[in-house]
Amino acid sequence: VQHLLRDDPRVMQLSTIAAVAFLIYAPFGYIPALGDWLIAAVADQTSAALAASGYPVNFSAWNTMERNGFRTEIILACTGIQSIAIMLGVAWGVPSTARQKVAGFLLVFPTIYILNIARNVFVITAYSEQWFPYLPAIAGNGEFGYESFFWAHNVMAELGALIFLVALAYALFLILPELGTLADSLYRLYRGEVERVLRPKAPQSGLQP
């Protein structure tokens, strides 16, 4: 906070990234009509991808798909908008040329959106086909078949998303070298404060050996 109050350019740059990410996410997160539109679009595209993969589903509600008696609801978190907003905030929140901004958009938006559809297809198929009915004591919640959803959604998909986002961030660093400069400056800025918290100085007694 103290660096922000001093208008430190490095912290102001980080604030710009956060602001850009929020401005991208906010319309979908806080305007129900836009959020529902995005959810419906992702649900329809996920259904089409499932049908093309040989696992057709039925809609029991506008955003809920059913197969083999197992229902999966698509919510805003299933659309990938959070990841898109964060990564576009990173890509657009640093000084760059128009060409770099376009390249960042083309790298981030279609890649995350398409892979998010693939993620939904994997989770729904794994759940409805009961691919991973393992360790119910750990993964179960009392609902029949939930274990497959847990392993597919909470473990495999999350781990895959983490690996992918790291790779995407690396690609952004190649397109926008300014990100590397910002990351290094932020590391140097906060390293000393973290060290002071983790290794506080011992109080001096006034006695010398």
Predicted regions and their residues:
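Hydrophobic N-terminal alpha-helices or hydrophobic patches in metabolic proteins across all domains
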Residues: V1-P209
